[in-house]
Amino acid sequence: MKIIDWNQLDTAAQAKTLTRPAQTIATQTREAVTALIEQVRRGGDTALRDITARFDGVDLATFEVTAAELAAAATAVAPELQHAMQTAAARIEAFHRAGMTNDYRVETAPGVVCERLVRPIARVGLYVPAGSAPLFSTALMLGVPARLAGCREVVLCTPPSKDGRANPAVLLAARLTGVTRVFTLGGAQAIAAMAYGTASVPTCDKVFGPGNSFVTEAKQQLAQAGVVAIDMPAGPSEVLVIADAAANPAFIAADLLSQAEHGPDSQVLLLSDSDALMTAVQNALALQLQQLSRAEIARQALAHSRFIKVATLETAFDISNRYAPEHLILALRQPRAWLHRVAAAGSVFLGDYTPEALGDYCSGTNHVLPTGGAARAYSGVSVSSFQNMISVQAASRSGIAEIGGCALTLARAEGLDAHANAVALRMGSAP
């Protein structure tokens, strides 16, 4: 990859340099997703069978995975992998449990009590991709916080393999996390099924999970139409690395490739004030690429990625906050000393021995993160993502006497007479 000198770019060129490859959804993709959603809305299970046969190449009589199939999944997964999944799930639970939101109660004035109650979303839908690779880790990342939140019903959709079955490790993850129902459905059609409901698939209140451009577009369209709530815009994976001259080139190359291998639409960026470091990373990339089973996919992603030379690390953080990466790696001598400069990122990885892959799997943080610049306004999935916050207030007779005058003044200033009257009647001062 060519090294770009940030200081040599004008404003337009700088903006172009930070443009994501999948930032603009092609018109044909948008129209295709709209058609798929409408087909599922009108045709239900029949439409799902037709679409699954068309895109996945399998004819399914039923979509739901049986209890027996879920139980059998454990025997199909190697003991070593089972143990790793159980260990990862425990760490994910420990981190997410520590950050859970609690009810609270405050007396805001004498005789006036305000509360916030935390309640689980009744039925949630989880989407677990299985396109270029079945991401059973995503089932852990979504299933654990859903269980901690107390959701009554957790529905999981994942694409079928060529034999019509779901990946055994995905099924095991679903079982480990207490998912209540699993369906072998993928793509935009799975999102539409969870949003509208069919004879087989229940209607969900909120849909979670990453996916390809079709999945992301389906989530966006259905959310914008008010059909279903979604977690966040979650598209192609991305990583931005800020490195100084002391960083390890081999480590950085490995981290860049771990994102690039996700798919050809992934993006990786390296920002550094050291030409020598970036040249060394380029050499390490070439060497490590030769050893990857998904080298061709990684090469396609690297083709639209960027190495950016900055004059100072302060500039690197300004660029990073503007880009708002899904993953931000600080390969710096004192990474924690720079953490206060981070204003927008999905998840941050500090130092040489915190590869992004740890967060993907088993450090405990969630890997379902905002992409495409959404980290400027969205956060990664947490237990709160699966909950509603309900406010409650109670005023006694003395309480309304205490604060009623304030409400009257504000209501009358806004010209809302009925609001004012509702307060005045209770204060015994209605005209």
From Swiss-Prot:
Report which residue ranges the record marks as coiled coil.
Answer: none
Q: What is its EC number?
A: 1.1.1.23
Positions contributing to Zn(2+) binding: 259, 262, 360, 419
One Gene Ontology molecular-function label: zinc ion binding
Give the pathway listed in the UniProt entry for this protein. Answer: Amino-acid biosynthesis; L-histidine biosynthesis; L-histidine from 5-phospho-alpha-D-ribose 1-diphosphate: step 9/9
- Residues bound to NAD(+) are 127, 189, 212
Q: Which UniProt keywords apply?
A: Amino-acid biosynthesis, Histidine biosynthesis, Metal-binding, NAD, Oxidoreductase, Zinc
A single cellular component GO annotation? cytosol
The residues annotated as the active site are 326-327
Q: What role does this protein play? A: Catalyzes the sequential NAD-dependent oxidations of L-histidinol to L-histidinaldehyde and then to L-histidine.
- Name the PANTHER family on file: HISTIDINE BIOSYNTHESIS TRIFUNCTIONAL PROTEIN, HISTIDINOL DEHYDROGENASE HDH
Which protein family is it in?
Belongs to the histidinol dehydrogenase family.
Supply the name of the protein: Histidinol dehydrogenase
Q: What is the lineage of its organism?
A: Bacteria, Pseudomonadati, Pseudomonadota, Gammaproteobacteria, Lysobacterales
